């Protein structure tokens, strides 16, 4: 589903529209969707800062605005001390934070995070939660987060959807817990 929403997978039936534009007719670079995939890819010959600046430039974000936003993201995610590192020099958790930063810099209407908390320690998870909440308030976009970390989802989401066997079900965020989800999955409730 995430690949379809982000236009990576065009092999589906039905129609996905954003602002009345059919997404299967939109060029990938013109998609109003940013996607932090579960398998990140970076330009290892560039620094972290340069990777973020390149993405901002490709999305036509004004230079000073990009500089300011990169600083906020680096500070918020605890990446400031790594800004001159190559992505190849980073730990898995730090690469995951960079992957999330790459999606957040894009300023799209929809930002998709696929397992954004994977590989993060509890401190890094809390940093990411705070940045997601802050950016969501400021940017006013839609954030779609796919995660198995129920506690983190409760901390950042105002709606939770459960996708199971091709069916989507909305669950009240305050009521989301492992037992309820396990019951829904096992009984097909």
Segments and roles (model prediction):
Residues 14-29:
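Conserved ABC transporter NBD signature motif
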Residues 53, 57, 65-82:
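Conserved ABC ATPase "signature" region
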Residues 86-90:
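Conserved ABC ATPase signature
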Residues 6:
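Helix-to-loop junction immediately C-terminal to a conserved catalytic motif
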């Amino acid at each position: 589903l995430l690949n379809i929403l982000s236009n990576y997978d065009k092999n589906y039936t039905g129609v996905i529209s954003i602002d009345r534009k059919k997404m299967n007719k939109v060029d990938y670079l013109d998609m109003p969707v940013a996607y932090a995939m579960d398998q990140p890819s970076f330009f290892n010959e560039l620094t972290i800062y340069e990777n973020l600046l390149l993405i901002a430039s490709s999305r036509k974000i004004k230079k000073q605005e990009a500089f300011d936003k990169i600083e906020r993201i680096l500070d918020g995610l605890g990446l400031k001390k790594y800004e001159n590192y190559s992505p190849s020099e980073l730990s898995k958790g730090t690469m995951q934070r960079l992957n999330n930063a790459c999606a957040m810099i894009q300023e799209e209407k929809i930002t998709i995070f696929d397992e954004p908390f994977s590989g993060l320690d509890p401190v890094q998870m809390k940093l990411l939660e705070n940045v997601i909440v802050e950016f969501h308030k400021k940017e006013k976009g839609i954030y779609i987060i796919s995660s198995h970390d129920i506690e983190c989802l409760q901390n950042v989401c105002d709606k939770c959807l459960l996708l199971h066997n091709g069916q989507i079900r909305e669950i009240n965020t305050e009521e989301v817990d492992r037992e309820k989800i396990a019951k829904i999955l096992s009984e097909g409730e």
